[in-house]
Amino acid sequence: MKAKDIVLKKSEEIEGLAIEGPWLDEVESLEGVISYYEKIGFQATHLGKAVKIWRKVEEKRKGGEEVRVFLGYTSNIVSSGLREIIAWLVKERKVDVIVTTAGGIEEDFIKTLKPFILGDWEVNDAELREKGINRIGNIFVPNDRYIEFEKYMVPFFERILDIERKLKRPLTASEFIYEMGRYMDEVLGKEKEKSIIYWAYKRDVPIFCPAITDGSIGDMLYFFKEERHDSKLVIDIANDIVKLNNLAITAKETASIILGGSLPKHAIINANLFRGGTDYAIYISTAVPWDGSLSGAPPSEGVSWGKIKAKADYVEIWADATLVFPILVWMVMKA
């Protein structure tokens, strides 16, 4: 075979979407640019597909069809400015079930007291420790936020104890968080109106947190119980798994939107295993699959477990959620 025949090998014709980006003289808005994403290629295409999937879910819901939307996110999502976007989604009844970590609860509450501050990645962390400043990436959290948080948690724990005495049973973590929303409604001012927990309480959206003690809430519980050795305060996580699984089982269809990985991701897709898998899935993550971690497992791996239906409409965007989630929400809800 001649070298030219090898290099210029004849190809078969294929059909598909032509790769194309926006011609900037022809688009008049960022929305117009983003409308090209599906045709750009690489992760832009994945973001474009995510827009289509979520729009399909929204159209069904607006048409009266039941698609129960599960939203999962790790605590760093709430550390960032994505917190307000999630709170808006809850306020507007765009999500039905939330699963997060302890940080996703406590940081939402703390931000109603004092803000987190934009810092830098390249700093002397030992000096920050001396100053009592905690760092989450390039976000700084002075420790007085946690001191203030404890001032609110002590009377809140007392309230939970009273409720549990009256009910003669422990509250589940989701009930604990619901009562936190009620507490915020009573003791906080206007600042609560950008809180996820507050709007979940107002809209009756359950927030599940299977690892509720794995954070500052756990620290506060430790201090509370150590200082009151007779304290009977208990949080029940066993009954929450029944409630979460049943929310998946009883839905006609489900959509799972997951920011990051870890416990929230698995809690949602595992609940959907009980119904034969979720129907729609959007993952946004920077985790990689080759270490076998759940955080890095792509949707297709979930299919092998029965947690995502084989015929489900799904996509994973490998990107920092702070970059793409605002675009995704805007394109689905506002464009």
From Swiss-Prot:
Q: Does this entry carry the keyword NAD?
A: yes
**Which cofactor(s) does the record list?**
NAD(+)
Ordered alphabetically, the record's keywords are: Hypusine biosynthesis, NAD, Transferase
Q: Catalytic activity, per the record?
A: [eIF5A protein]-L-lysine + spermidine = [eIF5A protein]-deoxyhypusine + propane-1,3-diamine
Name of a matching Pfam family: DS
User: A Gene Ontology MF term for this entry?
Assistant: deoxyhypusine synthase activity
Query: Could you tell me the EC number(s) of this protein?
Result: 2.5.1.46
Pathways involved = Protein modification; eIF5A hypusination
Q: Where is the active site?
A: K307 (nucleophile)
Top class in the EC scheme: transferase
InterPro entries named among the record's database cross-references: Deoxyhypus_synthase_arc, Deoxyhypusine_synthase, Deoxyhypusine_synthase_sf, DHS-like_NAD/FAD-binding_dom
| One GO term describing the cellular component | cytoplasm
NAD: is it a keyword of this entry? yes
Report the domain of life of the source organism.
Archaea
Q: Could you tell me which NCBIfam families the record lists for this protein?
A: dhys (TIGR00321), PRK03971.1 (NF003052)
The UniProt entry's sequence similarity note says:
Belongs to the deoxyhypusine synthase family.
Q: Which HAMAP family match?
A: DHS
State the function annotated in the UniProt record.
Answer: Catalyzes the NAD-dependent oxidative cleavage of spermidine and the subsequent transfer of the butylamine moiety of spermidine to the epsilon-amino group of a specific lysine residue of the eIF-5A precursor protein to form the intermediate deoxyhypusine residue.
Q: What is this protein called?
A: Probable deoxyhypusine synthase
- The record lists the organism as Pyrococcus abyssi (strain GE5 / Orsay)
